[in-house]
Amino acid sequence: MSQLDLALGAGVSARHVSFVETGRSRPSAEMVVQLAEHLDVPLRDRNALLLAAGYAPAYAQRDLDEPDMGPVRDAIDRVLRGHEPFPAIVVDRHWGLVSANRAVPLLIKGAAAHLTEPPVNVLRLSLHPEGMAPRIVNLGEWRAHLLDRLGRQAVVSGDRALFALHEELAAYPGGEPGHAPDLEAGAIAVPLRLRVDGDELAFISTATTFGTATDVTLSELAIESFFPADAQTAEVLRRAVAADALTPAP
């Protein structure tokens, strides 16, 4: 992006942007926020930019269990419960499990205890040889998808923890790092194909974030929802609900 494009998009003069970039002018706190908003800089990094410019952080970072976050917890619970009988989870910026609905234990059945005890990292749980990996039918395809997504997230954020996680997961068996297997003919998305109690279940997933977040914690939460990719998967999960086979998530 050129200085002119940035200036036009942020509603400031190109001359002022040039002076800020070269250090000839000290930006105001409002200017820092304005430029960061136009560049879609994450809230955590906006706070870091403000501190570097000599200003106080503008965005709070509350724990999810604080009273002010009550409406957020309620919204998350409504989404998770409303998605049943299909699985849904909430993760933080490092893919740590924040919450899950009652369908999730069906997917992680058989995983080693050390992977399902808090703190749980859902990517590690998915790809670890003692986790879900042995039951993932298309492990190479799913592994390549997750590593690509994690790698892009690490590059964009510059987060060392994400780079370290990527390095760890890439060392697990299950496919050649950096090589994405060919998708099935006519595929519309990378599916998760998982063996569960003798059935092969197939899912496609979506990621949902809070689009109007002004709190760092809230801005970094994502709801990962899994939808049945075929009629059999939907029926198996509906039967699990009817039989009261779904149990509270860990």
Where are these regions (language model features)?
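Hydrophobic protein-protein interaction segments
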Residues: 68, 77-86, 91-92, 98-250
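Recognition helix of helix-turn-helix/homeodomain-like DNA-binding domains
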Residues: 10-26, 34-36
